[in-house]
Amino acid sequence: MGKTFVYRFDQGHKDMRDLLGGKGANLAEMTAIGLPVPQGFTITTEACNDYYEKDGQVSSLVLDQIDQALLELEKVQGKVLGSDDNPLLVSVRSGAVFSMPGMMDTILNLGLNDKSVLGLASSTQNERFAYDSYRRFIQMFSDVAMEIPKYKFEAVLDRIKEAKGYQSDTDLTTDDLMAIVAEYKSIYQSEMGKAFPQDPREQLLLAIKAVFRSWNNPRARIYRQLNDISDQLGTAVTIQSMVFGNMGADSGTGVAFTRNPATGEAVLFGEYLINAQGEDVVAGIRTPQSIATLEKEMPAIYDEFIAITQLLEKHYRDMQDVEFTIEKGKLYMLQTRNGKRTAKAAIKIAVDSVKEGLISKEEAILRIEPSQLDQLLHPTFDSKACQEALCLAKGLPASPGAASGRVYFHAEDVVAHAKQGEPCLLVRQETSPEDIEGMVKATGILTARGGMTSHAAVVARGMGKTCVAGCSQLRVNEAAKTVDVDGRQIHEGDYLSIDGSTGRVYLGELAMTSVTVDDTYTTFMSWVDEARDMLVRTNADNPRDAQKGIDFGAEGIGLCRTEHMFFEEDRIPAVREMILADGLDDRLKALDKLLPFQRQDFYEIFKVLNGRACTIRLLDPPLHEFLPHEEKAIKDLAEQLGYPLDYLHKRIADLEEFNPMLGHRGCRLAITYPEIYQMQVKAIAQGAIKALQEGYEVRPEIMVPLISSAKELAMLRLLIEQTMQEELTAADQELAYTIGTMIEIPRACVTADDIAQYADFFSFGTNDLTQMGFGFSRDDAGKFLGEYVDRGIFDKDPFQTFDQKGIGRLFSTAVALGRLAKPELKLGICGEHGGDPAAIAFCHSQGLTYVSCSPFRVPLARLAAAQAAIKASGYSLTQDK
């Protein structure tokens, strides 16, 4: 006996999703537990894959099994497909393993033709109903299976309704419907070059093939790519005998959720229509009634429906989204599936389900997608406002949240207008460190260039600012203060709105929905913290971000970038003076001006942390990044420092590098200019001493960036220890501190055993490690990475999703060698991947001590770390069933 490609509903169960798809498996399960389900059968996902292997042909084996299942269905129903006496009608639905948009829509009433419509009219004693069903079928079949534009049919309907003064489809008479059927068949003949198929088996085969084809349509393929769903799964096809909600006042159809999908409240939520078919509810042609009113209209049906929905929720142990039809006073369940819900509802349902004894805490934790917490903790646009707004362009969703504001193209303009209370969007080709003040004051940031790890993206995430980056459809003219997009020109002061969670850019100002956390969220996150065994720190460069990270549950700072402290308006002149200094004496004078600023910064951060660890990265970027690039700013600097303009131009040119990311930066600056790191270490020591003397606990971890050789770290460790000791001795103070390094160069990974001899900890800088491991410049990779993903060379952009196969091997090598040389070595990650759930799971598997991410991603990282720990313990969702 060959493979089984077709299963009756009474032959399957809910754990056969891979074979029967979500829809087919759930219909089989509802049948098994005795619910009133119109019977039918499911053609498996394997039949879909077989169809593609046979170049778009349904094999004879599959056809034979369909015919056999159809015969059995006809016997059960006491009706025959295509009969002109008492015809069997069926619906055809796609049913992938995972629910996804883009798959083929439902076809209802399949089996109707010029003869069987008479049989339907006779058997139901309702001619109008029969022709209404026929016109619906022709339109659906033509649109969904044969891809004839829907508007061609809608135009006929609208014309007749307008001519006769009808308000609703229900006003159409039998004669009207007969005329519409005739016109619909003419449209089909004209579009397809042949008559509308009258053989029900031909109709069925065409519909099945259309479902299989829809598996590979562009929308479905893109959705699978975005959601990591395999192209090899295929879709099932569900064939189900029709029940009719449009047979009069004792019939109807509706959709309901067993809990409120927006809030999670444990009340039935849904709507229905009397005398209607399923698509009427979705199409919005008539206004549905709340499910609560069904209790008055049909009390017995309502009581039965309540009992069924409660049974389904207990059975599936999750909120269900159900479709139902009432035919002549009898209730039928057409579908159930786990309902989609907002982040707020997801957490409430998970917590309530634990309290109700439906699931365990572990399952509650595994049920919440970490990315949902991003949605919960950032403001979002009102969903209706988004639907009504004009979307101008789409870039990269670089930092989540929603922001509306007036467009300004220069940081100083943002600062000036923000002071007057205006909401401002900073719009740039790409941002640079000079824009930092404008970025702080802006409600959101929009750039035409740059990727998910560009300057704008990284800084925005750190500040919790909404950012859309790399929006290549924008033509930004910073000089003219205009941006051209989609045939429009936006001027300075015009309103735009950006959605950092989707990357969409909208015209005008959109209404927003703010989200606040409640006791349910607090309870859920307490379970998360109980479950995880890996620490979560935050990346923070100032006391404000440090406090924000702690408020979100961070257990310290995993990356404090000292260079970000240099860009404040009152200190950048001293930084530039230090960089442009002629010799050591001038450089030391400039550094003396910077020391008090850095000392105060560290003191303030240590106070906020009060005993929590603080990993401080010493100066990393190349010096030219701190210098101005626009002519006006260069002239102002020349006047400020008393330098001739020509001399200043020459000094700036001398500091320019062909490849600055691989140039004179990081520890290399300290080897050539040790006084820079000496000043920073003094500031750390003095800030720590002041905090200690005021009764605070201090735990500094000093981190040296860009180490590629153990000798570099040996030399700089000595410099740091000597400088620290001088300061501590002078103050007669003791302080426990550690010294470590960033692991961000491939050579450092493969010589980690040597480097570990001089390090108390390693922190993986995955941005640079990815950049150097692939040989990509992350600022230029946006030009080709999209194409790499589209063509299947990469599954994902490696700057967004950690590359476990390649960069992960370098990472694993460094972990193994480092711990071999020094078993007590602490390990962390502080690159942008520190907030990526897949990367966090990988870090857990490698035994890392902590992950560190931007403040707003801390809750996400806490949840991802808990999920990794639960899965590593061998727990699976099936244990709760």
Question: Residues of each region from the PLM?
Answer:
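Structural motif
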Residues: T238, Y408, L425-V427, L446, ...
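Short beta->alpha connector loops at strand-helix junctions that form conserved
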Residues: F41, A448-G450, A469-S472, C560, ...
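Short alpha-helix capping/helix-loop boundary micro-motifs
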Residues: L311, A480-D486
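Intrinsically disordered, low-complexity regulatory segments
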Residues: H410, Q473-L474, T522-M525, L535, ...
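Extended, non-globular alpha-helical segments
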Residues: G395-E434, V485-T523
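A short, small-residue-rich loop immediately preceding and capping a beta-strand
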Residues: T443-R449, C467, G828
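Conserved alpha/beta-domain cores
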Residues: R93-S94, V517, W527-K881
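Nucleotide/phosphate-binding sheet-loop regions of phosphoryl- and nucleotidyl-transfer enzymes
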Residues: M1-A389, P397, V415, E422-L425, ...
